Amino acid sequence: RQERMDATEQRSFQVGPLTLTLRQCLADGRIAMANFEASTTDQSPAICVGDVTLPISDKEAKRLGVDASLSCMEVAEKLDLPLYCVRALMEVTSSANAGTSMEDALWNNEGKLNYLNLSYLEPTQVKDTLPVRYYLAVRSYDPATGKELEHWIVEEESEIPILPKLAEKVYTLPSGVSTNGFQVKEVKAELYDTGVYFTATLLAPQGMQLDDEAMLQLYSSAIKDENG
């Protein structure tokens, strides 16, 4: 997966005083992920964060020579540096989105902010390429007051190639195999360059209502072989 991510054609976007560079991205039949790196366009020092209210990381606090208990806003005020809040997403279409996504902002060893996001895909809606929309937003804040000063947004439509499925295997289980009351009909394994995805088809007991309790049982189910 890392080799595929690193093979990304890097692109840069000017968003206010920052340059957001698409360092890594990939998509297969199950997930789409991207990593944007944020830095000031003129290379001047600044505090770039994903959330201005959170504490600064231990590594970044050590690099800057400040107390790790300080919030990012307090660090910017203490060091008299501009404060920017970043959000950088590679969004997929609603039809291709399986309904779950994640995002996080982390600092690399050089102190640059990396904004990562991942979306789970609906396999039946994925073709040879995946339409995406880059949503890139930067907000500047006054560290002393917490007031938002300016807000910049850049949006762009694009497409990225889909990694092909390399192999697929369906495991049919003996009748009567169950987990948490759900009968296991089959387990399918799909192999991509990014890894192996397992999908189980489960049959709910007759008359079972798919309420919150039932869904909790479903999500806590586990299927293991004789070796665990």
Where are these regions (language model features)?
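Alpha-helical, hydrophobic structural elements that either
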Residues: 1-228
